[in-house]
């Protein structure tokens, strides 16, 4: 009550922000007559003038009124479009490191030209980020004439472009591209073998379109670049045969319920758990198939990979459905994006899940992958000096934007008042009743000439509605992942009188639905249209436009509530753009996923008590409220998941930053000999310490062991025992110095053979390659640690703290291994002539290129089988107590990690 009263007196934070910005809008409007008087050349010359002023120390903020006035005037001359006052407000919000919530049809693309131009003046580059390649290309081509008129260069960054073209795109003042491609380029730059291979500049200003989709919907899944691991396709096939023998249990086991099934499914967490009975049965079946030895347990350390295969197969059968989560096309399993309904060609699930789905569908199983580099969108976008975004729906997620990205959300008012009618939800008992009611509604509306857009949450649901419409003889277009190519054309004509369009989720987002259809699309179909033809098409369109407005505008039907209120609002937002008429309604049933999982039995109980007959719907504020509460629950759960992912990824992020900084410094220098000399001293000290403990008696020295180690790991033949026999006065310190001096001498002889320049080149190559190889293994080990760390909670320990502690010690061990491997490799390499080093370099380059071609880019669930694979590889061979410890510390196993066991 008090807060409401204070808001009434002082206005909300949003009102105060807009009030402050409206003063600047007044100044920009006052400059308009002055700008109109300028010739084209004088207007273009403003860009150079602004750049000089910035160099002299003026701030970007001080240029806002003039720069915005220049862009508005240029837009009038190039496009014949004048920025509305609300678009100027939006531009200021975006420059202010905030998120601008602007309704659909309010011209976000044109608004973005203002802050993009302003921030490109510094010459550091602006990245405009869109959700797909089509929008990136469309927006770049649409805005190119405006920016080029003002003397700015425009680049497009698309997947599959060669490195020189990418470098050129990034060197432009303003670059358009997709979120995935920017992230992958960052990872690839940090895997480059020479400074020339890098494509990105320093990350300066990112302007994210559909910011909610990119920074929230896709934030749970990291970007991963992976390379091939070993082939285990046969195992997937064998395990896949076993799964159909298992029976699903309806509910999870608890104190009150002990089921009879073999596995239970937790739909909320998207996890599958074996029951006691299931474990016994699966172990029997594995023994019968000859996959596991009799008397062994699935949970024994030696069967860790087998457990991984069983879990992946169970998840593939119980949680992933064809035509909902993926489609099978040309013998390939293609993932369907749950947020947009689009297919994600070339993307693969990790953790062996994709292989398990391939086995289930009987298509060819492709090799598993090992993570080479990964980053989450949260951490990638936080690398930019300045970040801003725009969307039609951000207010429901304002808290998350603020707490994770430090971005405030500002709701920008619409240019014209919104008059769309949002009707209450109708809830039916069964799916069939709901579909029937939707068909009746469509019939009624199209009879009046009103266009209808039906939003579904999966391909499967869109095909169910499509089949029913076909039976009813209603002509319609289907827009889902299977018909990706016609997307923009179908969306553009969805406003045609009596048109019926079915769209999965938010497919076609970013394309306006114009009431009466798009006359531009009709003109584009004619080869050489005459002015008369164009005038006729426009006149016909005007008639259709008026007819659609009279029938009530575009009607939106939602066939199911989405987990997030925001995505429901996006669907509604396709109608009622720029003050047009429109309406919307959601049809639900008690069989919908959201209702089944979250709206509990209470609502269905209430519906039964009301004595509902088949085909009847309930329409009540209580029900709508119960659904909104269910959605809030899901939203807060998803927020917690993303927050937790971020907290864990922050640990990896600190390490990633340290490694990438080190790697870039290494790339930029040509001589690393000083570093090599310094780490050689460290490595030899640690190695000698393992056999000659500091300040110890001679009886405690293990000289034969040391000689053998130096020979095996560093290819050094040193008669240490002979030295000690001949020189009794040779004490520990002098001996250490002599061993190091001898190793340096041998190395220098190698250098004399090949020449200093060639050796420096070779040292740098070895260092980069070793760093990449160990970092890859470290990522796998971190994934593996992450998967099991939650179990520490049972020991009353905080899993996050444990993860931080252990990952830090793993990182320290990796750095020690790096030193050891580099010195060992450089010591062991045999060179007799310069050509041999050149041949090795060539071989290394070819191997790097081969791996680059085999790399796979994925944006998927945050877990990796690579880790488990690595653990299994190292778990096969038992380490002897006197062997060097595998951690690379240089100590014996019994004096290092062997002590723990």
Curated annotation (Swiss-Prot):
Annotated binding of Zn(2+), by residue: 885, 887, 896-897
Region (Disordered): 852-901
Cofactor(s) listed: Zn(2+)
SUPFAM superfamilies listed in its UniProt record: Helical scaffold and wing domains of SecA, P-loop containing nucleoside triphosphate hydrolases, Pre-protein crosslinking domain of SecA
Lipid bilayer topology: Peripheral membrane protein
Catalytic reaction equation(s): ATP + H2O + cellular proteinSide 1 = ADP + phosphate + cellular proteinSide 2
Subcellular localization(s) per the UniProt record: Cell inner membrane; Cytoplasm
A GO molecular-function descriptor: metal ion binding
Residue stretches of biased makeup (Basic residues): 891-901
Top-rank taxon, per record: Bacteria
Transport keyword on record: yes
Protein name per Swiss-Prot or TrEMBL: Protein translocase subunit SecA
Gene coding for it: secA
